[in-house]
Every structure is written in structure tokens, then in C-alpha cells.
Amino acid sequence: MTQYIKKINLKALIFSFILITGFLLLSSQATEAKPKKTPKRIKVIMIGDRLVDIAFNLGVLPEAMSVRCSMWPMCEKLLSATQIMGCPKCIVDRIPNIVPDTAKKRGIKRIIIEKHPNFCFYKPKVKPANIVPLLEGKGMTIEYVDFANGLESAIRQTAELLGRKSKADALINRYNKAMAKAKDALPKEKLGKKVVIINGTYQRATGKTFLRIEMPGGYSDHFMLKPLGCKNIGDALKSKNKKVNKGHFPIRKLSVLSKVNPDIIIMTGNIFAVQKALAIEMKKNPALADLPAIKALAIYGLPFYGDSSVMEYPSILRQWTDALSN
């Protein structure tokens, strides 16, 4: 009887942990995201999220921009500060007139474009420079920031184009110090843990949640799990009829987690959506409490890194390191 009560109490503790952790993570992330100073808005259009991320950290925002909002968390916070025209694919394929029309309407003559050898893992053919043929004969000055020689070079190029050369060294030094600390914090040996990454979306109007599992080989594997020596086992949860879109596939029931026994469960996107789904599933299926990740309370809400928030990479890597090394 005593053992039964202990088991019930453990499940109640886990259930409470899942609920409380999500709320704490959401509030802390919202606090950390606040910029220190309001950036100066200049009369230019920028295309490429890495470019805009650097510009923002140099204290500058374009009057209009094309970025991957689903990949760059800062995008949502800048909706009222600048015009977001759509992603680099949309402005070419779906709304090809938006850049020249926006430039004409706002009196903008200058376009700065990001050049990157691997702009998007999910859409290899998408390049910010694909917009250039649509701007020919429009009287635009087109300039580029080339990331081929690394981030430091890209920072210096951006700073020069924006008249912020004096701020380049400080930003580079800040990044290098943060990166050195992040690397020092990495485990000396591979952790060898099995990880499932669940991305959540919460529909406020209806209260519905939508979940996706991140497939191996994507951004989290390359930038987070590989340095930590962990394995993404999300593909083992994919049924034959599920289609992969942007490195993820949809999932409805988290009871399938029992098939793979993850050591760690990572929640990205809207953490509450994942947290809510886990709590509901545990009520239906109390046996989930015996999964290694849940039993050890190794359930972490972490920011997704899609190689857009380039200046924030060290701090995001450090968060993943702290969580997975625990």
C-alpha cells in the first residue's frame, strides 16, 4: 500500500512539474527577449534574417525587411517597428511586386541583401539574392553582406554599410567572449543521450494545440545535439503516412513516446502547447511516468535555433548545454 501511494505521489509530482515548468520558462523567456535600446530605423530594405539580426545588434533596423519569421524569434517582436514583407521565398514566388512596390511607396532606393552558402537547410534553392532580377531597371542600389567568410566578416561588412564601423569591434568581442564561454561549458565527452524534440503551437482563439516532431539532420542536430554528443530519435516516431515539412512532421498523440523511451524531452516553439499535451496524455496514460525522461524530470523548454539569431547562438547553445548535461 505504501509503495502504491508513493507511486501515485511521484506521478502527481511529475504532472505538477510539467505544468509549472512551462509557465516559468515562458515568463523567463519573455523577460530575456526585451532589447536594451530602441534601434534606429533607416531608409533601407534588408533581405535575410542573419543580416537583420546583426543590424539589430548594431542598433539599426530597416524600414522594411524580408526574413524567415518562423525561424527568427525576434521577428514577432519587431512587427510594430518595421514592415515585414514576407520570407525571401514569398517575395519572389508569391508576391513578386512587394519589394519594388514597398520601395516606391516609401521612397527607398537602397536594398541590402544577405548572401549565405547555406541560407536554409529546409529550402536549399531559396536565396535572398533571388529577388535581384525583379529589381532590375527600378533605380535601386543593391548591396550585399557575404557570410561565406564567417560571422566576424559579416559583422564588419554590415557595420560599414550601416555607418556603424565604430561598433563592430565591440559586437565581435562580445560574441567571441560569449562563444568561448559556451564552448568551455560543453561536456568533455559525448553525453550519448536519446532526445525527442517536440515543437508546439497554441491556438489562443480555440485553445487547441498542434505538435510537431523535429526530424534528425536539421538545425537542432547540427547546432545543438552534435556538439553535445546526443542523438535525435524523433524519426522513430514517424509513421509512413506522415509528411515531413521544414524538418518536422505532425503528431497528435504523445503516447507513442513509450515506443522510443527518450532520455530527454525537449519542448520548442510554444512550450505551453507541448506541456498541455503532455499533461493530458499522462492523465490518460499514467504509465508514461515510467519513461526515462519523465521519470528523471528531464523535460526542458528550450529556444529553437534555426541559424537566424546568429548573435544569440552562444547563449542558446549554453541553455541547451545546461539542460542536456543536467
Residue ranges: model-predicted function:
Residues 39-43, 147, 160, 258-260, ...:
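Structured C-terminal subdomain patch of bacterial secreted/periplasmic proteins
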Residues 49-124:
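A short, structured surface patch at a secondary-structure boundary
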Residues 42-58, 169-229:
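Basic- and aromatic-lined ligand-binding clefts that recognize polyanionic substrates
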